[in-house]
């Protein structure tokens, strides 16, 4: 548990020990707060000589106090990383209500919308996010962010900006996309070039914060328009996102995506994120933080135009599923997997399925001790001539069906550390390999097992160290 700093202790005292504040100290505090907030104080004295604020100034004072409490609460959140040490928003608001700093209605408004307006000033406690769209109909004919007036396939341009530019949710062709329905984030659409396809703007006062679920967010855009232009993607705040599955899926019109501004530190699933992006030739994932990601299945499946994928920044120590990760990347020539930690991966099925242009894959750092499924892993990898799987330890392996089917140029497979004791499904594992292939195995036991399943390959199977 992190140690509390002196600043943290001061904040706690400020937040929790207010009963001892004297009237004089309170007045001084209020005046200081008002000076800091740029509020001019107008006062009158009654017959008892007690200083009284005008009603307007009282409200301004109250707004300043609430704003100060908000700032202290946020600062405390930055100092203490542990939730158990932070004062929850509910407790802060209960205390402020008890002290008559806010009303019951204002407390409820903050809990529901994340903000409150006092003396004409909006005080934001929680920015909120845009709506989640994973439950929408996300085909090309589906709505976009809840708007049923436009189809995803008819959108030709997305512009993400950091100002509302005077737009209101009640404006024609404008709608509120904030999860709290407080107008924090808006979207509007127009047809500037009169071609019956839409330019959509997503806006907020500041960066647009995505929902925890960004699932299917940009799916199937531009399908009918025949193009999709994405501007201002760096204005998306992805810091709270946990689910990016199928975020750009079926984006057949995407050609270049620079996602280097994405904060992915909380993301747990990226399954199918670029699934079916058949025209994508370049994707920049340089700053991706994948330390919490568990699922990478189908990540690039169907990205048939891409030739190079650089995953140097990927930390995969918590990933369990890599099913179809590069499946159907027919033009993929180079993929860098040197940063991969695969110690927890149980499923590598179809990982390189139909990667017809790959001539070499470096597995030197792969740990396959947890892997159960290697089924279809290299199906139709027609340019591979050699596979060095010498560090594959497979004590938990269950399924190797059609593992090398269609690898018609493969002359050597080194599996000198693999064991097949638990394998239950092995059909067609070696069936389509060339007749002169050499398969290196660990010992006579593994040779006997493979030979018994594939007797026509008996002469091709060699024990390591033996000629």
Descriptions of predicted regions:
Residues 19-42:
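N-terminal single-pass transmembrane signal-anchor helix
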Residues 49-83:
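Membrane-proximal N-terminal amphipathic helix
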Residues 1-19:
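N-terminal leader/signal peptides at the extreme start of proteins
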Residues 53-55, 88-90, 129:
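Non-cytosolic, low-complexity segments of secreted and membrane proteins
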Residues 74-122, 126:
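Extracellular/periplasmic head regions of type IV pilus-like filament subunits
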Residues 124-134:
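Low-complexity, S/T/G/P-rich flexible repeat/linker segments used as non-globular hinges
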Residues 38-52, 403, 426-431:
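Small/polar residue-rich beta-strand/coil "junction" motifs that cap repeat-based extracellular fibers
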Residues 134-467:
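Negatively charged
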């Amino acid at each position: 548990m992190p140690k509390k700093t002196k600043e943290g202790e001061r904040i706690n005292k400020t937040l929790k020990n207010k009963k001892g504040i004297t009237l004089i100290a309170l007045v001084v505090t209020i005046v200081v707060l008002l000076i800091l907030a740029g509020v001019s104080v107008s006062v009158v004295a009654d017959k008892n000589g007690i200083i009284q604020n005008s009603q307007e100034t009282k409200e301004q004072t109250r707004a300043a106090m609430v704003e100060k409490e908000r700032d202290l609460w946020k600062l405390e959140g930055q100092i203490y990383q542990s939730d158990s040490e932070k004062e929850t928003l509910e407790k802060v608001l209960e205390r402020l209500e008890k002290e008559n700093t806010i009303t019951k209605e204002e407390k409820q408004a903050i809990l529901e919308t994340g903000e409150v307006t006092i003396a004409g000033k909006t005080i934001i406690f929680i920015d909120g996010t845009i709506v989640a769209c994973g439950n929408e109909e996300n085909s090309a004919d589906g709505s976009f962010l809840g708007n049923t007036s436009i189809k995803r396939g008819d959108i030709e341009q997305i512009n993400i900006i950091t100002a509302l530019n005077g737009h209101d949710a009640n404006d024609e062709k404008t709608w509120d996309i904030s999860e709290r329905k407080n107008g924090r984030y808006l979207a509007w659409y127009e047809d500037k070039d009169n071609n019956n396809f839409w330019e959509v703007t997503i806006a907020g006062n500041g960066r647009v914060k995505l929902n925890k679920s960004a699932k299917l967010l940009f799916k199937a855009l531009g399908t009918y328009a025949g193009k999709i232009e994405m501007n201002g993607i760096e204005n998306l705040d992805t810091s709270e996102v946990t689910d990016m599955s199928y975020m750009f899926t079926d984006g057949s019109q995407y050609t270049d995506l620079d996602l280097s501004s994405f904060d992915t530190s909380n993301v747990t699933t990226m399954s199918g994120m670029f699934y079916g992006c058949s025209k994508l030739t370049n994707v920049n994932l340089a700053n991706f933080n994948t330390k919490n990601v568990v699922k990478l299945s189908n990540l690039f499946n169907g990205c048939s135009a891409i030739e190079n994928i650089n995953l140097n920044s990927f930390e995969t120590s918590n990933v369990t599923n890599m099913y179809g990760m590069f499946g159907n990347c027919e033009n993929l020539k180079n993929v860098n997997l040197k940063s991969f930690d695969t110690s927890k991966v149980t499923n590598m099925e179809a990982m390189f399925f139909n990667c017809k242009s790959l001539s070499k894959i470096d597995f030197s750092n792969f740990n396959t001790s947890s892997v159960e499924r290697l089924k279809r892993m290299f199906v139709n990898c027609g340019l591979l001539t050699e596979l060095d799987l010498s560090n594959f330890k497979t004590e938990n392996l269950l399924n190797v069906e059609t593992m090398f089917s269609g690898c018609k140029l493969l002359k050597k497979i080194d599996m000198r550390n693999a064991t097949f004791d638990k394998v239950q499904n092995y059909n067609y594992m070696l069936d389509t390999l060339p007749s002169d292939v050499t398969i290196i195995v660990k010992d006579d036991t593994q040779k006997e097992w493979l030979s018994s399943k594939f007797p026509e390959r008996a002469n091709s199977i060699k024990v390591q160290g033996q000629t």
